Regions:
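Residue-level signature of beta-propeller blades and closely related beta-rich strand-turn architectures
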Residues: 23-24, 37, 126, 176-178
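Beta-rich, blade/repeat-based domains predominating
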Residues: 2-12, 95-116, 150-169
Length: 178
């Protein structure tokens, strides 16, 4: 399998959803922010264009119902300026705030959680690392943060992030597959 593969989701206190796509094709994982309310009127038509259930069957799955987000210029990145003008934006669904790559190639993003400050932690399964990204615009705030403990610490050895949570005191906890 190659390409984007949705792996983990998180929902913030405002109801916005975040989706981490693993990417098995030796490229960095991509995190997408989907707004629960409002949107970004990128085409300037005065309407927030978004994917919708046109067939009224309770599922958005037909090609005509899903507004695409695709690498139309072939540079391997979903391009979209953060502010107007949105010329060349490859995100057509205007409830999608942003899509950003996180970490290096072959990271395989398999862990994502929201911290007490509202920002996201994304774990790289293949690399044993976490990156902290902004919930506002997706830029990297911190990282890489290794899962390999300092020598002499309990459970010495690297972790393969598969799930995570941040407790009330702001401590990042990770779960490994093995």
């Amino acid at each position: 399998f190659a390409g984007p593969a949705p792996s983990r989701t998180a929902v913030d206190t405002n109801g916005n959803a975040y989706v981490a796509n693993r990417w098995f094709a030796n490229v960095p994982p991509v995190v997408v922010k989907i707004l629960t309310e409002g949107g970004i009127d990128r085409n300037g038509n005065g309407v927030i264009n978004t994917s919708s259930d046109l067939s009224n069957d309770g599922v958005i799955n037909d090609a005509g119902e899903i507004l695409p987000m695709a690498d139309t210029n072939g540079n391997g990145i979903i391009d979209c300026p953060q502010s107007a003008p949105f010329t060349g934006c490859e995100i057509q669904d205007e409830r999608i705030a942003w899509a950003v790559r996180v970490g290096p190639n072959n990271g395989l993003g398999r862990s994502m959680c929201i911290g007490t400050d509202g920002h996201l932690w994304v774990g790289m399964y293949n690399l044993g690392q976490y990156f902290k990204i902004s919930s506002v615009d997706g830029h990297t705030i911190a990282g890489p943060v290794s899962t390999t403990p300092t020598a002499g610490q309990p459970n010495a050895g690297g972790g393969t992030p598969y799930g995570c949570l941040v407790d009330g005191s702001g401590t990042l906890w990770g779960a490994n597959l093995s």
